[in-house]
């Protein structure tokens, strides 16, 4: 009973509570801030209360549902290890960021809007991962995207923030359309949105249709989890407050695509391996994204940019592992989720520490840093833990989770994927060393000497310290997590140290470390020449492999072509809309001229009548062209009058759904302007 109540309250509570943030803010801003923290705390408690029942042996998914839009379309919760793992992650990080925000966002304008969106996001993200059907999941999928857009554009007075928000919104919408297509095909094939029904009846769908569903779903995951080729939005999203970057763009929202593919693999079951090229495509997208993200992290001078590209790369690791699932082994599926949690801890830690550094220095450019080790020793120590974990060194969490990913890809047998993933681990170590050198080591820059930097407030350091502890502790949870996730895979702590992949892993770190040492510590002439702008490779990295350049050219030309087409169509419509009336008018005039030559008043009156009708028609058509909105309004009124015939029970559902959507949109508009 407790888990049933908790599974509903864990997402409904933050959603409803978000509506009270503006009300409380009218009385006390401090109460508003702590209200958000308290709700986040209660949400986290509710999330953790879901663990015991699964841990103590529930073999089948739990949950319940209720009628929503109609008796056939329900809203419900689906409690299994996958949904609970994500729910706990989102709720825990929501609490961490709510506490961190008390310090980081102190004194900012628009905090009512910030905390409203924060709670709305937490509720929406949990709703996404705990839904028991595709339609409900998609509604929350869209709400998460809307919150992301609003939070990225939080500093809306900055043009770059508005542009970044719009870019993220538009690029992720491509994935949303793809996912919606998959859901539509699934519903057309099964007649149900339910996960349970899909699991029981998925085999009835023809393989070509199922393949289309799988690839369309992958399209949604690619956009949401910043995979090639729709990855460029994540770097632009760094215009958001760093607390937002930590929650949405490191720990939770960007993992929605990973959740989606992991869920689809569970639904497909053995059929996943019969779909032509689907799993290999998932693996290749992940491997290439991981490699490309690591190379860009090694180039950018932006401290948040390094973390953004690192996130893209680590998401690639997770996607690659999901693609390495085989009929005989689910190790890749487990490794992906194990690393998903590891990444949340070390990348979330990185963003929290970057927020403290930016808070103290007022810049994101690492070239203006250096020498922070003395001024910010606690931040330095925590950053060292973050980098060692990111690099996958023992005994930190990513050593175990990343090792399992490498093992799963090795077992899958594609040698080129294995080579690229090893190369990516070397690049990860390299950009980690570069991060530490540019930020903390060496002499203070002139910029720092003028600022006299200091440690971040304790309210910002405590959440970071908790994540640092988890960076160490999480790796030892692997054997327990295997049982919790109900996966048949061998995970051994000692086995991680003595696996065949471990010596290779350590061997490739040596040249990576040597290159960074020669470049940034010894300033080797050869390496400095390699890094010069004259090197074509540096030009490629500077432009991010030219993805944005291509997109801007395509969309720019597309918009120009579309605009020109609309203009011509409009001119054609406006020129032709009165032609029927003018034709009638001309015909009537000729009739009148003819009748004057032949006979009396009756024909003349008929001609005059036709002329009057023609003039009225011409006037009406001109008004129609100029006042399309009035026509739309008229149609809407007619539609509303027809709703009288709709059964009252259905009408109540439609009105309730429409009213809820209207209230949410209205609140977002009001809060975006500022309260």
Each language-model region and where it sits:
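Hydrophobic alpha-helical transmembrane segments
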Residues: 76-91, 207-221, 420-424, 497-514
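Aromatic-capped, Gly/Pro-kinked transmembrane alpha-helices
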Residues: 481-500, 522-675
């Amino acid at each position: 009973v407790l888990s049933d109540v908790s599974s509903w309250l864990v997402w409904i509570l933050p959603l409803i509570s978000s509506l009270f943030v503006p009300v409380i803010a009218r009385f006390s801003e401090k109460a508003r801030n702590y209200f958000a923290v308290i709700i986040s705390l209660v949400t986290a408690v509710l999330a953790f209360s879901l663990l015991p029942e699964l841990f103590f042996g529930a073999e089948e998914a739990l949950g319940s549902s209720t009628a929503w839009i109609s008796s056939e379309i329900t809203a419900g919760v689906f409690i299994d290890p996958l949904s609970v793992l994500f729910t706990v992650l989102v709720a825990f990080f929501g609490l961490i960021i709510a506490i961190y925000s008390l310090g980081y966002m102190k004194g900012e304008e628009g905090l009512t809007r910030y905390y409203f969106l924060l709670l709305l996001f937490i509720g929406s993200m949990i709703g996404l991962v705990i839904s028991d059907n595709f339609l409900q999941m998609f509604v929350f999928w869209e709400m998460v995207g809307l919150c992301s857009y609003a939070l990225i554009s939080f500093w809306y007075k900055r043009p770059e923030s508005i542009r970044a928000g719009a870019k993220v919104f538009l690029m992720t919408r491509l994935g949303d359309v793809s996912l919606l297509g998959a859901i539509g095909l699934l519903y057309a094939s099964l007649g149900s949105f339910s996960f349970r029904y899909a699991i029981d009846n998925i085999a009835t769908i023809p393989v070509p249709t199922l393949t289309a569903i799988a690839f369309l779903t992958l399209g949604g995951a690619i956009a949401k989890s910043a995979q090639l080729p729709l990855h460029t939005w994540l770097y632009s999203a760094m215009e958001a407050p760093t607390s937002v970057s930590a929650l949405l763009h490191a720990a939770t929202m960007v993992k929605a695509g990973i959740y989606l593919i992991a869920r689809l693999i569970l639904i497909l079951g053995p059929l996943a391996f019969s779909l032509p090229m689907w799993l290999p495509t998932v693996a290749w997208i992940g491997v290439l994204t991981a490699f490309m993200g690591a190379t860009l992290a090694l180039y950018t001078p932006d401290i948040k940019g390094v973390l953004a590209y690192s996130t893209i790369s680590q998401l690639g690791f997770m996607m690659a592992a999901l693609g390495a699932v085989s009929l005989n082994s689910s190790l890749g599926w487990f490794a992906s989720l194990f690393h998903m949690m590891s990444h949340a801890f070390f990348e979330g830690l990185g963003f929290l520490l970057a927020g403290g550094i930016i808070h103290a220095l007022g810049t994101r450019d690492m070239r203006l840093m250096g020498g922070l080790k003395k001024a910010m020793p606690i931040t330095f120590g925590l950053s060292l833990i973050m980098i060692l974990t990111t690099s996958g060194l023992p005994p930190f969490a990513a050593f175990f989770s990343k090792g399992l990913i490498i093992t799963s890809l090795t077992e899958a047998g594609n040698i080129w994927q294995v080579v690229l993933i090893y190369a990516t681990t070397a690049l990860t170590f390299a950009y980690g060393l570069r991060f530490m050198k540019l930020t903390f080591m060496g002499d203070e820059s002139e910029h720092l000497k003028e600022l006299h930097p200091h440690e971040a407030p304790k309210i910002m350091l405590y959440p970071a310290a908790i994540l640092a502890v988890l960076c160490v502790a999480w790796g030892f949870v692997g054997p327990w997590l295997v049982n919790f996730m109900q996966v048949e895979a061998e995970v051994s702590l000692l086995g991680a140290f003595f696996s065949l992949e471990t010596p290779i892993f350590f061997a490739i770190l040596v040249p990576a470390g040597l290159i960074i040492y020669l470049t940034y510590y010894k300033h080797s002439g050869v390496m400095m020449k390699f890094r010069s702008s004259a090197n074509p490779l540096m030009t490629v990295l500077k432009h991010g492999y030219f993805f944005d350049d291509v997109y801007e050219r395509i969309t720019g030309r597309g918009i120009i072509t579309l605009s020109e087409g609309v203009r011509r169509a409009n001119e054609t419509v406006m020129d032709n809309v009165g032609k029927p009336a003018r034709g009638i008018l001309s015909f009537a005039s000729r009739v009148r001229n003819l009748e004057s030559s032949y006979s009396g008043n009756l024909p003349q009156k008929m001609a005059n009548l036709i002329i009057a009708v023609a003039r009225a028609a011409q006037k009406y058509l001109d008004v129609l062209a100029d006042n399309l909105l009035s026509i739309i309004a008229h149609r809407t009124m007619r539609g509303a009058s027809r709703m009288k015939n709709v059964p009252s029970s259905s009408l109540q559902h439609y009105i309730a759904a429409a009213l809820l959507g209207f209230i949410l949109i209205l609140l977002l508009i009001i809060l975006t302007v500022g309260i």
